[in-house]
Amino acid sequence: MASAIALSSSTAQNKITLKSVASRLQQTDDPDIRVWSQSVGFHLQFSNWKCANAFCRFVTDAYNLTPYKECARSITRQLTSLSNYLSAQTGVSVSGTQFLLSPSDVEVPVAKTGESVSDIMVPSYSVNGTSMEFDSMAQLAQALTTGFTFSVNDAQIGNAPAQTGESVSGTGFIAEACPSCALYDKCPNCTSELINDDGSSQSPGDIPHWTHHKIASGIVNILSSDMSSMEDDDFANIAAHVKKALGTNSHPANNDMSKDQLNWLLNIAEASLIRKADRTALPMNAARIAARRGWREKLFNEPADKLYTLLRKSKDSFQKSAIWGILFEKASNAKHYTEIVFQDIVKLIKEECNPSNNFYFKVMAQSFLDHFRMLVIDNPDPVANLPKFILKLKPLNLKMIIENHENTAEGWIVTLTAVAELYGWLEFAVDLVPKIVSELYDLLTSATQKCFSMVRELLTNLNILKAESFDFTNPFWYALAALLSYFVTGFLPNNAKCSAIKQTLNGATTLVAGITAIQKLAAMFSAWSNESVVDDLSTKVIGLTEADNPTVTQDIDAVTNLQIMAEQLKDQIKLKTLDPTFQPYLPVLRNLMSTTDSVISHCAKRKALATQRTAPVCIILTGPAGCGKTTLAYAIANRLSAQKPSVLNLNIDHHDAYTGNEVCIIDEFDSNPDSKFVEFVVEMVNTNPMLLNCDLIENKGKTFSSKYVIMTSNNETPVKPNSTRAPPFYRRVRIIDVTNPGVMSFKYENPGQEVPSYLFSNDFNHLSMSMRGFGAFSKTRVIDPEGRKTCGLEGPPGQRVDVDDIVRYMQRMYRENQMNFKSEAGNNRLKTPRFAFVTQRKHVDTVYKILAAAKTTYNGYYSLTKDSFDVNEGHNIGSSVFVVGDDKEIPHNCKIFRCNHLAMFRHPELAHIEGDNFRAALGVTMSDQDVTLMFYHIRGKHIQDEVRLDELPANHHIVTVHSVYDMAWALNRHLSLTGKWQALKAVYDLYMTPDILPAALRHWMDNTKFSSDHVVTQFIVPGGTIILETCNGARMWATSRRLIRAGGISNNNGPEGGFRFGSIAPRDIPWSEILREFLNLISLIWSRVKGATIVLTALLLYMKRYKPRSEAKGKTKGGRGAIRHGGKGIVLSDDEYDEWREFNMEKRMDMSVDEFLMLKHRAALGSDDTGAIQFRSWWTARQMRESTGLDHDDVTVIGKGGVRHEVHRTEIMKAPKQKKKSFAWGEDMYAEGDGKIVNHVNAIVPVTGLCGEHIGYAVHIGHGKCISLKHVLKTGSYVFNQKPIDVTFDGELAHFQIQQPPSSAAPVTFSSKPTRDPWGRSVSTEWKHDTYNTTAGKMYGSICWTATRTQPGDCGLPYVDRAGQVVGLHAGSGGDSAPGRKIVIPVTKFKLPSNTVLSNRFWKEEAPTISYKGLTVQETGVNKAVLKGTNYHVSPAHVDDYQDCTHQPANLGAQDERYPVSLTSIVINNLEPYKQPTQGPPTEVLNKAYNMLVQHYEPLIPKATTHLEMGDAFAALNVKTSCGPYITGRKKDHIDPETGKWDETLRNHINARWSLATQGVPIPHEYQLGLKDELRPKDKIAVGKRRLIWGCDVGVAVVAASAFKEVSSAIMAMSEFDFIQVGINMDGTAVETLYKRLYTPGTHRYCVDYSKWDSTQPPNVTRMSLELLRHFTDKSPVVDSAVATLSSPSIAVFGGVSFKTNGGLPSGMPLTSILNSLNHCLLVGSAIIQVLESKGVDVNWNIYDTIDLFTYGDDGVYIVPNFVHSVMPEVFSCLSSYGLKPTRTDKSSAPITEIPLSEPIEFLKRQFVRNQFGVRALLDRSSLIRQFYYIKGKNTMEWTKPPEQIDLTSRTAQLQVVMLYASQHGREFYKKCLDYYQLAMEYEGIKLDAPTYDEALAKYNANFNGVEDCDLLPAGYDEHRLDKIVFEN
């Protein structure tokens, strides 16, 4: 609210207290404001609306504030509510409010009849205490407007007693702050004053005592959420006592409950009420809501981490519930606050925010006590056992192991294995995880069982000191008990709890009483601890219900997230209901669960309204009345579903009776005369959700959900064919004509008689049914598809059908509808396996009997069906098995096994005798896994309390549960890999609550994944027997009885079979199953010898360690061996010996072996001392020498230089024969790759397997969204060390989410082709997609050719286009036979991560485009017109001769007589070149030039260690430039000139862009177009040419400055000495350095300019320039975002449209001069390299070391040596082939030639000359002359008229500097300029005389040499020059 008040004085800078307001109010002379003061506070009285309005005016005037926006509406609403009542009482008009509030905003309360003025209280702002302060005048004004009580003596808020002081007359209204008064007949805040400190009442008849049964029963009702029997007075009375207890410690409520409990009581009541409307009746509900809203406003913008911390530390339930509300709101709207917030909050829900603070302390303390007990008590004779202890310790062996330890991976393996082997822990080390679980459990169990025994022993052993030391009345024990309370509950006890502790300890005067006291304390601590947990759950539920609001969760994603969090919270509450220690709070927990259930139900309903469904199948049974249509409808319904059908009646407007069953019957659906049934049917038979109209509250949101709809009608044509709704109606239904010939004949023959029953049959053979064709509205006609013929078209005759045909038709149509409908993810888990056994028709019965016998023998769960696939799988827990003939069509979702009838005849008795090995009897090849799946698959999870012995499966394992560890170990057999982790969690839960085993198992089964193996385990527990059977799903039986049952069937005797009857029937299994059994056997063998295997492996690693050993050769150990043994016993290998000898010989050193090894180690570790550097240089040369493969020898050379040792090659080097070139690339083409990935390195994340092995890669594209390949994700389990979620496959392409993405993201595009592979090399491809066979299956992609050899593990790396956007992913190569052939999977279109910032853009890829004057554009809806007019005026001195000037102001539009053309047309013409991208250099040539330029800059540019922060980056911008397309005006227009602070518009925009940039995500790259106001040559004006201005978005500019400001500054600092002259001072000594470089001996000079430079810049070159800048940055996400943004196509916004460029580089792009110059260098270098290589020259040196360049954007001077000079014509032709247009500097069409030494060089429109004063860069003379012709003034269309007012100061400075420049051209030209200057003095009013020629010459030279302050600014700073000394070109 603070931002809603505009202050004009300094009063807002200080806190404003109510006391100061009170003082000023008492001093006011306004008669309409009546004030009085008394002991309880300071009060206001408004006798009518005029007084209230006067008070508002006083606040405005006294504190100099102006309410507006939200603050004004808030204040005025409350004033209006007050005035409406006062108007009714006084009759005074309230029209004065209309100037503040619109009529639609006025909220008029309805006053109750008969109420007096004093009974109406305004719910308002409450203040209590003298120190109350307000942050803003808005809050103060609101408090004053609605009334307040200011307590000078900290008195309680309440009704004012009789006034003291000035009396108040009339029907005055006291606007006193009491938020709860409106909620009660007797306000508890007011009636609390009537309660005494002891709990009694001053008026016992009104308010009962605290101990009264009404108070107690009321509290119970609140906790049980059953408040229907409570009266309003009951609420008020309870709240009054609670308020008194919170303010007075002596109230008896504090003896029963603490203050935390009192607030907890209200929290529970509020959280337990399901409907928010019911909460208004709670005590102090309004104040509670106000408190939470206040916390929400204060904390909503705080970072998430701070909220988490506050949540864990806060003891304020209001603050905590407000924080939970904020967290739930942000997590629901995760797409606005990132998925990380949602995942963190889901985890936070599972935590208890008030856990025991001493969990680890307790574990450590108990562990210490256990060890101390072992040494002191359990070991009575430690001296006698000391030798045994030493022998067990084995200190000698341990010391040897430690001494031989090495701090390496291998060293740790050896050491740990040796220690484990030494102490016999090897098996323990192998099975470490289960042992840790067991030990931890035992330790924690011991800790919980010893608390009581320790206290008892302590009291027993020290009983003699009881009277003196254990006086429990001593305060020390209270403090000790309080400390224990803190350790147990996490909270220090308050007064009430301390009183309870004191009362308990006071009676502990004996040992027994002491033990009893300790037990009571333990129970109290446990209860208090649980109170905090329940309170924490209540605050979560309150926050959850506040988030369950359509204004908070506005879209389906937010609703889904809220439902997930509600389900998580419900699970947490559910676990507490299973905990016995929480049984006293069970009613409260159940109420909390009910509230969460209501939130879940509400979310589910909202999702159902937004979730697409499968369209139901609808038929209409038409025929005459009484023929049996309704009976037929119910018969069809019974065959379609086992459920009873739902019934709808369309004659009523509400459908509360609809039950949502699978079949719905609508009888006589068309009986409504208004034809409303048509729209109902169209909406019902649809994939969109259908919301039913229901009256009951609980049915609101009910949707139609039936699968099949059967309607009846007596009308042959329900909808006339001429109706506009006939086509959609008949397209959705199928009509079946039903007639009963027997009944009709009887009725005609026997009129008036009842139809006999024998005319009807149960199989409906009495009916004649004919199904019409699709779209038939009658028996012979169908709807015309185009609706032109009302009579329709001739249709096919009806098809005769029976009931079974109708049922099959409806089932088939529904399955087809499902195929067209994407089912929700997650339902696949309940998919039923289906097996089809196909045989000859005559053998179907035999196969059926064999399978039925096998099912009976082995108690299989599958359903067996013959000759049909129609089975209701919803009623079967197992798989579905079908036996069909080979003439039957088999559905695609069945596993097919074809039976061999010869095998059945060979062993027909096998299955009938035993029922086993049915595979041999059927002659099918079937794996054991399929057999297990078929027999024992369990669909879903089932819990059965009723146990029938004949239904129980046979046991595989029987486990007697002695501890939870036994349970966990047995459950391990049942679990899948992910389920094992859930088992560990179950162990912890069962440890915490071991007495609730059956209930906990039920809860645990809901979210557990079970193994695909069939396992049955019987658990014998103290409370009974549990039988668990699992196979994908699970069944569980629980009983309190003991069951004694035999063991089950082993694997060898199960349906998997084995060898029977002397191997007459061996099982026939696939080869894959045999391989699986072999690997299983190997694993079993290894498990038997795993200990020995580890020991042998460690021994091998130990033996491989470096050990001193003798390597002497020959018969003696002398010679070389003796030398090698020198050096302090160090032994060298042969290679090390040779290195030591060669190094000493070549460096002429006498280095010992020890010194040599030390030097080698220092060099290897990267030391930078002289010796290490020298050794690395020598080592590199030696390696290069040996890499040739030729022999070398050390020789001694004796010559003039003395004796020296050298290495000579002794073998002749032969030139290799060049292979014959062919189209097939050879192996040598792949040796240049260094394997370094260069494309979007920070956005590429690894995909790893379960054990951490590398599988491939994925690419992060922003907001946690990633793309990869299907075969990579199918193999890999983790992406960036986390599980991928929401995985979707589009062919081979996979896109998914990860919760913790990398810091950067890569841009993607769907409409381009790759030009570079992941390693930066060029790609050759036609980019035509097709299907290719690979080792990972068929893939749809394109073939690309690159010169990079790839290897397994490279799949998923990105290929990019010219702009660096990802267009495809690497999926495979041609292997060794064709390594250059790659398959690339294109990135197809899918929904990119949404973001509110990205939605704020003018060009949207998904939006439609239009053609606008030849450009493809999108409409923006915002017309940003191009600015008309010019600021240039003709000087008064040249009104008559301005035509003599070579330049004039640029074209002004269609009204300009010089060339009438609209400004929009000029913009369009300028954008034409941007429609097509220029070619640019070949990728491999550009890469080579890029690497050379980077190598050139490496020693010159320091690498930045960090990027600029947002504020620093903005400070580096020119604030006089445009803000871009989103914000109007210039940057300085949005900055406070005094404070420098940004306004809200600029701050919000930059913050939004910056938040994306910090994630590495590209931001919109858009520009506001304008036309440059400048002087142009008259020949340009004659053809309407005018240059564009690209106004860059300020957000893009800030991000670019943050990323590249330091690098660009470093480049500008070298402008005098390097290739880029941006920032150089052309009027200083730097030009002398340039001049020397120009005339380097042996070089040639070329001056070059370019036409249309900006629009012809190749995108791939710009991308490489940005990569070069990135190379010298910190490569942070902000840098990645800047590169991706500036590389993306720029968007031009103008005239209500936006245009997407395909090439070019906008002149307004950030760092445009630097980027243009880098582009210039890369283009020239690429052209030289390409031309030289085309001549057969291998450019293996850095080309930039041999040439010199001057570049500033498109201006260039090339200084080249002789060999480059010889090919310069081809270089310029090559530049033209790139799409550039190089020209001479004079813009003539002549070829570009070398500049002779006799001619001056022109650069930046200056000529380099040498005069008597030195080297000067002369400005063009015409540029100086035209300064006299034109003056800048106000914008005008009549530029030929002089300006009305001339800024003489600026004009004088401009012309003075012109004269200084003119002095450099000689006396004659200076005299000419002097004449112009004198004319200006005469006509323009300039007073300052021009300097003489000598004065001007001396001043310029002084400025040039730096003697005086220079006003001549360096090049590149045109923005300052235009503002000060203007030189218009």
UniProtKB/Swiss-Prot annotation:
One of its GO terms (cellular component) is membrane. Residues 1643-1768 form the RdRp catalytic domain. Keywords: ATP-binding, Covalent protein-RNA linkage, Host endoplasmic reticulum, Host membrane, Host-virus interaction, Hydrolase, Membrane, Nucleotide-binding, Nucleotidyltransferase, Phosphoprotein, Protease, RNA-directed RNA polymerase, Thiol protease, Transferase, Viral RNA replication. One of its GO terms (molecular function) is ATP hydrolysis activity. Pfam families: Peptidase_C24, RdRP_1, RNA_helicase, VPg. The record marks 176-177, 468-469, 825-826, 1111-1112, 1232-1233 as: Cleavage. CDD domains: AAA (cd00009), Caliciviridae_RdRp (cd23192). ATP binds at residues 623-630. The modification O-(5'-phospho-RNA)-tyrosine is found at residue 1137. InterPro entries: AAA+_ATPase (IPR003593), DNA/RNA_pol_sf (IPR043502), Helic/Pol/Pept_Calicivir-typ (IPR004004), Helicase_SF3_ssDNA/RNA_vir (IPR000605), Helicase_SF3_ssRNA_vir (IPR014759), P-loop_NTPase (IPR027417), Peptidase_C24 (IPR000317), Peptidase_S1_PA (IPR009003). Residues 1235-1391 form the Peptidase C24 domain. This is Genome polyprotein. It comes from Canine calicivirus (strain 48).
